[in-house]
């Protein structure tokens, strides 16, 4: 058993327990004790690590990203979503090769780990992606993920062909039998997929008994496209198809009205909130406070580096908090506790993984990050730790990261990704 001593622990559990000068005990991959110092636990330890007053919190959960796009960082700034996609992103992705995408994913894994992210939910354009190579890279990194091929409607492939190709990838991923590398059915969006493909995607998700992952209600332009095409707004259209009755992660959820918020509250949908990407593409500000009050699970996400332009979840959480205060006109909204939970346990709920990760509790996987505040002026005074973790911390402040009790980042250097 390994014990981390002299640590200040932010558990992000249901009651948001915080233990100052506490200990965290890990046996194999699981947490076996978290709390104030316990002499019996210390006596049983095979190894005691003196953390010298460091801060420990759960590994961060990135609920929506596109790691294969890491090579497109900075490809196009100052464009709205649809111009950005059609004029720059999709043409660039058409030129992807396995060498390019594997390199991009490894770079994303490195960036995520260095900034404290331990779990991510990925949607990737299948063009130029070798799933076997990606699996080996993610497996070596020790990160946990959903890695899902995106479905699009096109002139070069029928719906049946797209579904068959996607099913093949799903079966390949399932064949790995790796609980840390899973898959969802990921139709890109209501505007880039035909009705037939959206229906077939839902059928495939039911058949494979896996969740859906889709961009929904991201922009006013999307709402206009779907209203013109089907006579309904995006959420109503997907509800008609049955999407709200299947476990799903909806990325964005910016353009939602009161009736749609109420419908989401009675659905199996969770929201991946991408505040910085939504700002950069001028998409809008998601009604996160209203979603949370309605009981909808909302996690934080970075989207891709092509629209962000980094994978810094701490920056994302800070931006989310500031935006919700501004949007509501009430500075008490989205407080520190809510922000830290959104980065961790709420993200785990979005991905259906809250029984395994997202908080530091006995029986859960030992996924956590360590920040040593000593010598970092912007993290002083140290007694205001919780405030600093939302409003002052930088991704570069992360010193160490553990996944399943195994160290994957040491002194800011990633140990498990070979670039």
Regions found by a protein language model. Give the residues of each.
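His/Asp/Glu-enriched, well-ordered alpha-helical/loop segment
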Residues: 240-247, 289-375, 392-393
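Alpha-helical scaffold segments that flank or form the walls of functional sites
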Residues: 73-143, 164-176
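Metal-coordinating catalytic core of metallo-dependent amide/deamination hydrolases
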Residues: 129-254
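C-terminal cap of metal-dependent C-N hydrolases
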Residues: 12, 365-416
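N-terminal metal-binding scaffold of metallo-dependent hydrolase/deaminase domains
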Residues: 1-42
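Active-site gating loops and adjacent loop-to-helix segments of metal-dependent hydrolytic enzymes
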Residues: 71-103, 141-142, 146-149, 155-156, ...
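Glycine-enriched alpha-helix->loop->beta-strand junction motifs that scaffold or abut catalytic
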Residues: 142-144, 202-210, 243-246, 263-272, ...
């Amino acid at each position: 058993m390994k014990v981390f001593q002299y640590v200040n622990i932010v558990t992000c559990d249901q009651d948001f327990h915080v233990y100052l000068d506490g200990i965290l005990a890990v046996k194999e991959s699981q947490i076996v004790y978290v709390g104030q110092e316990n002499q019996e636990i210390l006596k049983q330890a095979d190894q005691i690590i003196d953390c010298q007053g460091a801060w420990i919190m759960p590994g961060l959960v990135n609920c929506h990203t596109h790691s294969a796009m890491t090579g497109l960082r900075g490809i196009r700034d100052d464009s709205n979503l649809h111009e950005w996609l059609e004029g720059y992103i999709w043409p660039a992705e058409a030129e992807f090769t396995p060498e390019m995408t594997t390199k991009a994913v490894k770079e994303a894994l490195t960036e995520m780990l260095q900034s404290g992210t331990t779990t991510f939910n990925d949607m990737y354009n299948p063009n130029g992606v070798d799933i076997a190579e990606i699996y080996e890279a993610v497996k070596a990194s020790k990160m946990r993920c959903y890695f899902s091929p995106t479905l699009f409607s096109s002139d070069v492939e029928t719906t049946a062909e797209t579904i068959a190709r996607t099913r093949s990838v799903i079966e390949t991923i399932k064949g790995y039998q790796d609980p840390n590398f899973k898959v969802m059915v990921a139709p890109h969006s209501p505007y880039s997929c035909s009705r037939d493909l959206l229906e077939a995607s839902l059928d495939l998700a039911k058949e494979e008994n896996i969740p859906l992952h889709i961009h929904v209600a991201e922009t006013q332009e999307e709402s206009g496209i779907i209203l013109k095409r089907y006579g309904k707004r995006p959420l109503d259209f997907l509800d008609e198809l049955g999407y709200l009755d299947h476990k799903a992660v909806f990325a964005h959820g910016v353009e939602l009205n009161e009736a749609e918020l109420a419908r989401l509250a009675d659905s199996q949908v969770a929201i991946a909130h991408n505040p910085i990407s939504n700002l950069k593409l001028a998409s809008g500000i998601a009604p996160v406070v209203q979603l949370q009050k309605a009981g909808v699970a909302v996690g934080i996400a970075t989207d891709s580096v092509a629209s962000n332009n980094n994978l810094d979840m701490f920056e994302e959480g800070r931006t989310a908090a500031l935006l919700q205060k501004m949007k509501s006109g009430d500075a008490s909204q989205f407080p520190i506790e809510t922000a830290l939970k959104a980065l961790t346990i709420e993200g785990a709920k979005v991905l259906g993984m809250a029984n395994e990760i997202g908080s530091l509790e006995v029986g859960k996987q030992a996924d956590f990050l360590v920040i040593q505040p000593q010598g970092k002026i912007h993290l002083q005074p140290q007694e205001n730790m919780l405030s600093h973790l939302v409003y002052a911390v930088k991704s570069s402040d992360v010193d160490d990261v553990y996944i399943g009790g195994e160290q994957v980042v040491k002194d800011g250097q990633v140990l498990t990704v070979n670039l």
